[in-house]
Amino acid sequence: MHFFYDRPAAVQKWLGDLIEVVEGAGNITVLKGAKLKRLDGQLGRFQALIRTSEGRERTLSPSAVVVATGCITRPAEAMSDGGRCIGSSEMEKLLAESRDLPVAWKGQPVKTVTFILDRTDDDIKIHTVNAIKLAVILQEKGCQVAVVARDLKVSASGMELLYRQARGKGVLFFKYDEPPVLSHSGDGISVEIPDMTVLRKEERETVSLLSDLVVIGETFAADPETQELCRVMKLRTGAGGALMEDNPQFLRVMSNRRGIFLAGACRFPQIIAESLSEAHAVVQEVKALLHGGVYTPVNPVAEVDPPKCAVCYTCVRLCPHAAIGVERYGDRNVYSAPAEKNGDTLWQAARVDPAACFGCGICVAECPARAITLYQ
């Protein structure tokens, strides 16, 4: 990304300045090229095994963890022919490289550009933001621009103003129900859509937009390394491998494990302003959670009666919050049980970590030995 949609500033310079501030802070350690190999413990006492870029292993003891791995983009199907269909990120790079010069594609001037939205992800508004932002820049460079969309999403802050600005500069907007038909026409591409201003479908005529370039939003996907990270951290994934599916019981920045937070596009593709808002929200959540150095559960938590536990691992497998483990119980163990089992003073039994328990009650309902109860 090279341009903000809501202010005239270079994204890369802004990002570079932020990186310099972080790397120059005395209380922040930056480990470039490092990988998380293992994460044990719970809120306030995590144990993270890190492998550095030099191949050495290092153990960290964070009180909380924030995941902000982002996502990757994949080209849309219509761009697979390698012709004059490009992605929005490629168009943004082209405009950044052209600077004050006229826009050119492979040595040929670009006079007409058509943006096609909602072919990949209908629920993501970042495509609309990027399209209108780039359309304004192209129009200022003397290009004729059209935006074809099923539904324009201008709910982001400042987007309605940018939309009106784009229309004022001459950007054309078209709505469609059926996906546009693309065909090669001479040295350009013809984009055919029905005229949606006519109410009767059978009376609609076809509008043909001859374009030097067609820009299509890419598909966003979870990074394969993020999948491995979720396995190590025991985090749940939603559709497409993104971290955490929508859950009305959790805030956007919360994960299924207490003390582990999410920010940015690792959960859902979004614009910079939304990622910054989530980052500020994470800061406040971490401060509230760790304030005073003591965490007191506000909801009922599960408790295991060790002598009744059959060590069947049902609760361990079913717990969505990784709050249950199997511990050794005995006189010398901190989790001691007064009774004996089969004449042995040492045995294994499940144990619920109160700091990690959300009180959902799944383990209580599924325990075949009825060894788990909820208490306040």
Segments the model singles out, each with a brief description of its role:
Residues 1-376:
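Residues forming the flavin
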